[in-house]
Amino acid sequence: MTSDEFNRLARLAPNLKRRALVYDLIRAFFRERDFLEVETPIRAPAIAPEPNIVPFESEEWFLAASPELHMKRLLAAGYPKLFQFSHCFRKGERGLWHNPEFIMLEWYRKGAGYLTIIADMEQMVSAIARGLGLNGAITYRGRDIDLTPPWPRITVKDAYLKAAGWDPTTDYDPARFDIDFIAKVLPSFPFDRPTVLLDYPSPAASLARLKPENKRVAERAEAFIGGLELANAYSELTDAREQAARFRE
């Protein structure tokens, strides 16, 4: 080890200690709510269908891009509340905010809808902030962000009409949807508060339950803080026939 490498690693000590405390706070949050911590395999014979995720091959199997499939098997086997910290692997995701190997926190509640999962997330983030002595707010890039729940919410329809001038829930264009999100929609979110984006076009959420009153819209949500995606959630589609039909579409 060179002296530069030694000094670089030594400087990480405060962040590593803070990271360990965050893990403790997250575990305490879920255990207080009767969640079971699990550890599922890192290799799998198949991966969840995600068009924008390229997996790493491991002989004839794949390194897990997420723990979703294994955790859903446990959920179906009768475990009602689960969480885990999982090492995940995705090709082509290297940059300022991405790495091909990263740790994902994933949790499930049997029968819970997407708004319940989002509420879990808001409460967990607030609990972490309190545990770190941050008094319900963080400072990022020199600006304060108030984490007090509930966080502001806006639907995909309203966000795109406001920032980009069109409604992707009635006229979905995947390329335009992605480009306008990065260039117009995300920059329109307030910086001083997190934002929860709700109710995605159904083609952008193939595993999510459709809203009963509008089949063009799926019960999916994503949360953003300081211009970064923090979490996503959706109401699970549990009808096998409908799922097969959605895949065919």
What are these model-derived regions, one by one?
Residues 6, 25-27, 35, 41-74, ...:
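A translation/RNA-centric and nucleic-acid-associated enzymatic feature enriched
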Residues 1-5, 30:
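Auxiliary tRNA-acceptor-end handling modules of aminoacyl-tRNA synthetases
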Residues 23, 27, 31, 118-125, ...:
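Hydrophobic face of alpha-helices
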